[in-house]
Structures are given as C-alpha cells and as structure tokens.
C-alpha cells in the first residue's frame, strides 16, 4: 500500500489516467487476498483456502473476457451478467472486489488529501464527540438549522459519472461499470443503510462508494457555502421616493419617524456552518426564513443538476433554533435563550448592558435507551428487569464485565447531557437484570446475590471511570457540568 502511494506521489498521472494496469499486478491481489483471509473465520489451512478460493490466472481471464465482451453490461446488451459471472463467483468475486477497492482507495486518498490542502478551514475528525463542541460554539449564533439526510439510494450510472471526474482511462471505467451493475443489489438503499449503522467488512466497497459520492457532493457544496459566507450584503434602507435616487441619497441624513418603522434591512453578516456524520448533515444559518428557504431550494437543484439525483423534500427540514429540537448522534439538541447582564464601569460612569444568547442543552433520550434495552431483553417497555438467560453459561466475572461495559459506554457517550439523573435511572435498571441473571445461574434469589456481591455488583470499572473524571476536573465544579470525550470513535456495546 505504501509503495503504491509513493509511486502515485512521484507520478501523479497514473491515478487519473492509468488505473487499469494495476488490475494486472499480482502483489495487489495478494494484498486483497490477505484482507479476505484476515477477516475469514474459517479454520481450514491457508493452503487449502488459496487453492480452492483464489486463482490469479482466473482473475486475468475474467478481466480479459470483460474487456473483449461487447455486450457484457445488461443496460447495453441482451446477455445476463449474473449468469455470465456466477459460474466462477466463488473463485474470483472477492479478490476482484478487494483489488478494486484497494485501487480506488489509494487514488481517492491522494485526491482527497490534495483537496484538503487547498481548502482552508476544512477539518475531518474521527471522534464523534468532537462535533459537539463545534455545535456548542458556532450554532448558538445562528437562527435556523437545516437538517439534511444525505441520499443513500444511488444508481450505478451516477457513481460512474462521479468517477469520470477524476478517472480518465476508459478500460477502468468499463470494468467499474460492469462490477457496479453486477453487484448493484449490494449498493441498494437498504444494504447501505445497514452498513452505515453497523459497518461490516464485507460492505467495504459499498461504504467506500457511498463516502466517495458524499465527498464529491461536499467538494462542490462547501466552496459554494464559503462563497456565500464571504459575499456579505451591505446595509441599506427602503426609500419612499426613488426619483433621482443617486442625487438624493447624498443629502439624506436621518429618516423621518413615520418612515423608520418601514425600514427594511438586509443581512450584513452571514454565518454558515456545516457538520456531517454518517448520513446526517446539519447546516446552521443566520438569516431570515426566506433566505433559508432559498438555501433549501438551491440544495434541491444542486443534487438534481450536478448529480442527476432527485431528493425528496422531507429530507431537508428547516428548524428554527429557539423553537425546535434536533435529534443528532443520539442527542436531542435544544437551544434555550440565556439572558446575561454585563456591567462596565468607566471612570465614574456605570454602563449596564443586557445580552441575550443561545445556550446548547444536549439531552440524552432516556425513553429511546429504555426501548433499546427492552428490545435486547434486559427489561420490558415499562422498565421491569428481565434476566439474560443466554448469558447464564458464562462465568460470573464475564457477566459482571458485560453489564459493566454497557453502563460505562452509556455514561461515557452521554457525558455531555444535562439530564444525568436519567442515566442513573438506566444504571439502576441494568443493575437488577445483572443480579437476576446471576440468581438464575446459581438458582438463588436476587437478595442473596446482592448480599454476597454487595457494592461490587458491576461497579469496579465504573468507579475507576468516575475517579478519572473527578481527578481531571476541579472539585469546586458542579457534578452536573457537561464534558465531551474526544477519544470516542465507535461505541461497541457487548450485547
């Protein structure tokens, strides 16, 4: 992989014009084959897997047949590509997909790096919680939030047109078109939605195609937003008499009282902030409702004309910041008006200024967490505990560790919420299924388990986490103070 990137750095032309020869390099298929072996859970010897699964000669023959086949794609011929490729699917389907993914990832990484260098202010971060400080700092200065769901139902031809912007050699595009039409069921809306929620290794190519598509959208959208932000409108008033406007404007000093009420002011400073995680995007805007509606109108036409994709109107919701709550990354984001009184003393004069700001109040969805626990059979929908009979075959330490990690993940992720009391209620609900599971395993009662375990019932690592948090912050601060964890990349709940 490093060798390919070094070669691409020295010779940038190959990533745009000569991708096709990379399909005939054996070391590339060795990398792809190693990827498949690493994630394979089979206990067969490696020699048997290689002989039965992978044949580089078969892959070469496949690519040669695809190149010579004039009607290999169902859209332009009468042949059935599924019958054409199913005969040897077990021998080369995974290596071809893995090799295609490796080639596209290397070329795309170099292109996105060049784009990030040219775009000032563009930041790509991995931590989930790094988004919330940005929202807390920037969004309160806005009036509206545009909640966008990025379309994930993508036709293969749209992806091919997207890749044509940075891949110029025709053989690679033909091979890519054939593969996309053949595996189009893997890139359907349902499969992509599942892959975005629960990423899997076998959806690597699907996730790459979707991310590259979103990246292409953002590469056009973000510069347009930055241009709109920099083009600030100047203030001007509505004059009742516009006759000889150029001559009269120099002599106007102040408006009469009866006209000042009709004065119309345009927006002077436009604030636009864009945040995306997964298939959800938030655009915070400061302006009038008409300007926000125009922004949504332009987004519709942006997707329609640039990417030949019709987006449903319900995918872009306009929310007024002070009246509506937005559900984003597991939080209910609400902005409340917070009045501030500022006193400034200059010599003998005392000035008092009233300021009104918006404060972010992230709320953890206790009801949704409770429904999730009920779905996973920890309790019913009313919160009554249920024992995990499938865990009774585990040791006591494993059972305690699993419940402990679930509780830690919840407190770790929702550390920025203002309703900590609800999290302690969830912890109490998890405490009872843990004791009930241990009681079912040892054929005893919950009272006996709690008397034997005492305060050590899945609280060891929890108290270690609390000690770390308390040592990081001053003791004079409130226990209800919110904080964000910048080390959260993905929450893996052991259920």
From Swiss-Prot:
Record flagged with keyword tRNA-binding: no
Function per UniProt: Usually encoded in the trnK tRNA gene intron. Probably assists in splicing its own and other chloroplast group II introns.
Cross-referenced InterPro entries: Domain_X, Maturase_MatK, Maturase_MatK_N
One GO term of the biological process aspect: mRNA processing
GO cellular component: chloroplast
Keyword tRNA processing: yes
Protein name per its UniProtKB record: Maturase K
GO function terms (MF aspect): RNA binding
Domain of life from the UniProt record: Eukaryota
Cell location: Plastid, Chloroplast
Keywords: Chloroplast, mRNA processing, Plastid, RNA-binding, tRNA processing
Species this chain originates from: Torreya californica (California nutmeg)
Xref: Pfam families: Intron_maturas2 (PF01348), MatK_N (PF01824)
UniProt similarity note: Belongs to the intron maturase 2 family. MatK subfamily.
């Amino acid at each position: 992989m490093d060798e390919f990137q070094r070669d691409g750095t020295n010779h940038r032309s190959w990533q745009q014009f000569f991708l096709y020869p990379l399909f005939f390099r054996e070391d590339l298929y060795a990398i792809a084959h190693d990827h498949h072996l690493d994630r394979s859970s089979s206990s067969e010897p490696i020699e048997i897997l290689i002989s039965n699964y992978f044949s580089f000669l078969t892959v070469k023959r496949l690519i040669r047949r695809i190149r010579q086949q004039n009607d290999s794609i169902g859209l332009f011929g009468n042949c059935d590509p599924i019958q054409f490729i199913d005969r040897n699917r077990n021998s080369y389907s995974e290596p071809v997909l893995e090799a295609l993914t490796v080639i596209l990832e290397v070329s795309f990484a170099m292109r996105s790096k060049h784009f990030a260098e040219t775009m000032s202010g563009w930041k790509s971060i991995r931590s989930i919680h790094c988004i919330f400080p940005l929202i807390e700092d920037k969004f309160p200065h806005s009036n509206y939030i545009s909640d966008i769901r990025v379309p994930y139902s993508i036709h293969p031809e749209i992806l091919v047109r997207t890749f044509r912007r940075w891949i110029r050699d025709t053989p690679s595009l033909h091979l890519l078109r054939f593969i996309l039409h053949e595996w189009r069921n893997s890139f359907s809306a349902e499969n992509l939605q599942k892959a975005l929620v629960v990423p899997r290794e076998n959806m690597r190519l699907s996730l790459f195609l979707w991310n590259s598509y979103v990246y292409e959208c953002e590469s056009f959208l973000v510069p347009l937003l930055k241009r709109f932000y920099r083009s600030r409108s100047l203030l001007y008033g509505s004059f009742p008499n516009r006759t000889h406007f150029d001559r009269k404007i120099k002599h106007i000093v102040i408006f009469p009282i009866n006209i000042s009420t009709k004065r119309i002011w345009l927006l002077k400073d436009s604030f636009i902030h864009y945040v995306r995680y997964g298939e959800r995007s938030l655009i915070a805007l400061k302006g009038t409702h008409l300007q926000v509606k125009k922004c949504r109108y332009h987004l519709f036409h942006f997707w329609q004309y640039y990417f030949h994709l019709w987006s449903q109107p319900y995918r872009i919701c306009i929310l007024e910041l002070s009246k509506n709550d937005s559900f984003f990354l597991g939080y209910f984001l609400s902005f409340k008006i917070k009045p501030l009184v500022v006193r400034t003393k200059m010599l003998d004069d005392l000035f008092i200024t009233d300021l009104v700001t918006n404060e972010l109040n992230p709320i953890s969805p206790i009801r949704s967490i409770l429904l999730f626990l009920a779905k996973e059979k920890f309790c019913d929908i009313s919160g009554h505990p249920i024992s995990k009979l499938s865990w009774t075959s585990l040791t006591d330490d494993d059972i305690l560790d699993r419940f402990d990690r679930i509780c830690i993940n919840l407190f770790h992720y929702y550390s920025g919420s203002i309703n900590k009391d609800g999290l302690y209620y969830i912890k109490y609900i998890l405490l009872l299924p843990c004791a009930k599971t241990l009681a079912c395993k040892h054929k005893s009662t919950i009272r006996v388990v709690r008397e034997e375990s005492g305060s050590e019932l899945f609280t060891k690592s929890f108290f270690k986490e609390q000690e770390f948090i308390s040592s990081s912050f001053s003791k004079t601060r409130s226990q209800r103070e919110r904080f964000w964890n910048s080390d959260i990349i993905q929450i893996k709940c052991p259920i």
